[in-house]
Amino acid sequence: MVSFCATLIRQFRHRSAAAFQIAESAILANKSITLASSACSVNRGQLQFGIQIVREYSKASKMSTLPRVFFDMTADNEPLGRIVMELRSDVVPKTAENFRALCTGEKGFGYKGSIFHRVIPNFMCQGGDFTNHNGTGGKSIYGNKFPDENFELKHTGSGILSMANAGANTNGSQFFICTVKTAWLDNKHVVFGEVVEGLDVVKKIESYGSQSGKTSKKIIVANSGSL
């Protein structure tokens, strides 16, 4: 998206440098198209097109700066595939950084080799306990627990990435990936990202779950890191 918009911007600038400059200035000054076009002889249609492209480029550039991390998953040591997650560092920077650093293992501990210990079909897949491996442990990069950052992002559907907790302000390293919309968790669990690739892998993991949460196969994060 960024490269596509950049190409359009180059083409637009080449066709009408004046329109491009005015479009850019109009956005920066928060001026209307009418006001900007009335101050010059540039065609209104050209100016409108320019403003649209500059805005899309700005939006795409911002989106491209969000960190992405991955899990390479196995079930009973058989490869399942890769899950790629985009972290909302723009909304919950502290929570996103915790997850990112645990994916890379740069603090000396993290998700590599850990399991998904609780998987409930039509609900979620939970992991992140790399200390006790049963849902009772884990720790954050900030120490043991850290506070809820905010609840701006919601549990809107499949692929949403959220912090597991034992109550308010008890975030550590445990997390879950939703497989359905879970609105009842809004304002109780901090959403900090979503799956952008490999949702089919999440569905495979879900298929090994049960209503009790016990998995029929050992689901392991064989490798993890940043992209």
UniProtKB/Swiss-Prot annotation:
PPIase cyclophilin-type domain residues are 70-226
On this chain, the residues bearing Phosphoserine are 158
Q: Which InterPro entries match?
A: Cyclophilin-like_dom_sf (IPR029000), Cyclophilin-type_PPIase_CS (IPR020892), Cyclophilin-type_PPIase_dom (IPR002130)
| Cellular component GO terms, alphabetical | cytoplasm; cytosol; mitochondrion; nucleus
Notes on how activity is controlled: Binds cyclosporin A (CsA). CsA mediates some of its effects via an inhibitory action on PPIase.
Reaction equations catalysed = [protein]-peptidylproline (omega=180) = [protein]-peptidylproline (omega=0)
Q: Which cysteines are joined by disulfide bonds?
A: none
The record's Pfam families line, in alphabetical order, gives: Pro_isomerase
Task: Give UniProt keywords alphabetically.
Answer: Cytoplasm, Isomerase, Phosphoprotein, Rotamase
Q: Where in the cell is it found?
A: Cytoplasm
Q: Which GO terms describe its biological process?
A: protein folding; response to oxidative stress
Major localization class: cytoplasm
List, in alphabetical order, the Gene Ontology terms for molecular function in this entry. cyclosporin A binding; peptidyl-prolyl cis-trans isomerase activity
Reported EC number(s) for this entry are 5.2.1.8
Q: Give the domain of life.
A: Eukaryota
Signal peptide location in the record?
A: none
Primary enzyme class: isomerase
PANTHER family per the record?
PEPTIDYL-PROLYL CIS-TRANS ISOMERASE, PEPTIDYL-PROLYL CIS-TRANS ISOMERASE D-RELATED
Q: What family name appears in the similarity comment?
A: Belongs to the cyclophilin-type PPIase family. PPIase A subfamily.
Q: What does this protein do?
A: PPIases accelerate the folding of proteins. It catalyzes the cis-trans isomerization of proline imidic peptide bonds in oligopeptides.
Record's protein name:
Peptidyl-prolyl cis-trans isomerase
Q: What is the scientific name of the source organism? A: Drosophila melanogaster
Q: What taxonomic lineage is listed for the species of origin? A: Eukaryota, Metazoa, Ecdysozoa, Arthropoda, Hexapoda
